[in-house]
C-alpha cells in the first residue's frame, strides 16, 4: 500500500484533537455495556420466535464491532490525525468504522418497516414478519453493505501530508472515485432508507388514527416509537451526510479547490464523531420498541444490582443470575398457587402439576 507524500490542502488537525476522542471515549464507556445487554436481550427475543429480535440483535452486533474500532480512532485524533498502526489496520478499522454507519441505518429502516407491517397490516403480511424472513433480510443487508463499502479496500488509504501527518481514510481534497462513492452513500445508503422510514411513520400514523380498538396511551407509545427511529437517523447521521454531500459536490465542480475543505474540516470531523452516538441511542431504542425487552433488561439490571450489593456474592450469584428452567418455573407456579389459596401436590419429573382446592375453614 502506498503512503507517499502529496501536496494536499492545508488542514489544521490541532483544532479538533479533543472533541472527537472525548466523544468516542464516552461512547465506549456507555455503548459497550449497554449493547452487550441489548444483545443478550435480543437473543432471548429471538428464542421466543420474535422477528424483531433478529433485527435488534444484528444492530447490536454492528454497534459492538464499531465500538471495538474506537480505541484506535481515539489514538488517531490524539496524535493530530496521525495513524501509527500501519496500512493493514487502517484498511480494516476504517472499513468497519465507515461501513457501520450504513449497516445501522439499514437495520433501523428494517425495524421501522417491520413495525409498520405489524400495526397497519398484521394479517396480510404476517409471512413477512417471521424469524426466517428476518434472518434472510438481515443477510441481504450485511452482504449489500459490506460489498458496497468494500471499494476502499482496493485503494491506498494512507496519505502523508507535507507536515508528515499520516491520514487514514482521509484525503483533502478527496479523489474523484471517492466523490462518486460518497454520492452513492448519501442517496442510497442514507436518504433512501430514511425516506422509507418516513413513509412507514406516515403509514403507522394513519393506521393508529383509524383504529378504534387501540387505546389512546397505546397510540401515543406507537407514535413515539416510530418518531424515535426517524430522530436517531436524523440527529446522528444527517449532519455528517450534509457535509459529505457538500464536499463531494464542491470537488466534482471545482477539483483541487482547497478553500471549502479547509473551512469545513473541523465541522466535518465533529459530524463524523456524532455518528458514534448511534451506538448509545440504539440500546435505548431497543427498550422502547419491545415490551418483553424492557422486562428482560429490567430483570437483568435488578439481578445485577442485587449481586453487586449483596453481602454474600456467591449465594446471590447462584440465586439471582440463574436462568429460568422448566423445573424452576414449576416451583414458581406452585408458590404462586399456595399464595392464592391453592395447594399443589409434589409433581414427579415430566408430570403436570396437580392443583387441589383447600377446603373451607371450619366455622
From Swiss-Prot:
Main location as per UniProt: membrane
Pfam families xref list: 7tm_1
Membrane topology qualifier: Multi-pass membrane protein
GO MF annotations, alphabetized: G protein-coupled receptor activity
UniProt-listed CDD domains: 7tmA_GPR4 (cd15366)
Stretches that traverse the bilayer: 9-45, 50-80, 86-121, 130-156, 173-210, 215-250, 261-289
Chain positions carrying an annotated carbohydrate: 3, 164
Purpose: Proton-sensing G-protein coupled receptor activated by extracellular pH, which is required to monitor pH changes and generate adaptive reactions. Activated by an optimal pH of 6.8-7.2. Ligand binding causes a conformation change that triggers signaling via guanine nucleotide-binding proteins (G proteins) and modulates the activity of downstream effectors, such as adenylate cyclase. GPR4 is mainly coupled to G(s) G proteins and mediates activation of adenylate cyclase activity. May also couple with G(q) and G(12)/G(13) G proteins.
Official protein name in the record: G-protein coupled receptor 4
Species for this entry: Sus scrofa (Pig)
Amino acid at each position: 500500500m502506498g503512503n507517499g507524500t502529496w501536496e494536499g490542502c492545508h488542514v489544521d488537525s490541532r483544532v479538533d484533537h479533543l472533541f472527537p476522542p472525548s466523544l468516542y471515549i464516552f461512547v465506549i464507556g456507555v455503548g459497550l455495556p449497554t449493547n452487550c445487554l441489548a444483545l443478550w436481550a435480543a437473543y432471548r427475543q429471538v428464542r421466543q420466535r420474535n422477528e424483531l429480535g433478529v433485527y435488534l440483535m444484528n444492530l447490536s452486533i454492528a454497534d459492538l464491532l464499531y465500538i471495538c474500532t474506537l480505541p484506535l480512532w481515539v489514538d488517531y485524533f490524539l496524535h493530530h490525525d496521525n495513524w501509527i498502526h500501519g496500512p493493514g489496520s487502517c484498511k480494516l478499522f476504517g472499513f468497519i468504522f465507515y461501513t457501520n454507519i450504513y449497516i445501522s441505518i439499514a437495520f433501523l429502516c428494517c425495524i421501522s418497516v417491520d413495525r409498520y407491517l405489524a400495526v397497519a397490516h398484521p394479517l396480510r403480511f404476517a409471512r413477512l414478519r417471521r424469524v426466517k424472513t428476518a434472518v434472510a433480510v438481515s443477510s441481504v443487508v450485511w452482504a449489500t453493505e459490506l460489498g458496497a463499502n468494500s471499494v476502499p479496500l482496493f485503494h491506498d488509504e494512507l496519505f502523508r501530508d507535507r507536515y508528515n501527518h499520516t491520514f487514514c481514510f482521509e484525503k483533502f481534497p478527496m479523489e474523484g472515485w471517492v466523490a462518486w462513492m460518497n454520492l452513492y452513500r448519501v442517496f442510497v445508503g442514507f436518504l433512501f432508507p430514511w425516506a422509507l422510514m418516513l413513509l412507514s411513520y406516515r403509514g403507522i400514523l394513519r393506521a393508529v388514527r383509524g383504529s378504534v380498538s387501540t387505546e389512546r396511551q397505546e397510540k401515543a407509545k406507537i407514535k413515539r416509537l416510530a418518531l424515535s427511529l426517524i430522530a436517531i437517523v436524523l440527529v446522528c447521521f444527517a449532519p455528517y451526510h450534509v457535509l459529505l454531500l457538500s464536499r463531494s459536490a464542491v470537488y466534482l465542480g471545482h477539483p483541487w479547490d482547497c478553500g471549502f475543505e479547509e473551512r469545513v474540516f473541523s465541522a466535518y470531523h465533529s459530524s463524523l464523531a456524532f455518528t458514534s452516538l448511534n451506538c448509545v441511542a440504539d440500546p435505548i431504542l431497543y427498550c422502547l420498541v419491545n415490551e418483553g425487552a424492557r422486562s428482560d433488561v429490567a430483570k437483568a439490571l435488578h439481578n445485577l444490582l442485587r449481586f453487586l450489593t449483596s453481602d454474600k456474592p456467591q449465594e446471590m450469584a447462584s440465586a439471582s443470575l440463574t436462568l429460568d428452567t422448566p423445573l424452576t418455573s414449576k416451583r414458581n407456579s406452585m408458590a404462586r398457587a399456595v399464595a392464592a389459596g391453592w395447594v399443589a401436590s409434589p409433581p414427579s419429573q415430566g408430570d403436570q402439576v396437580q392443583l387441589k382446592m383447600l377446603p373451607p375453614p371450619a366455622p
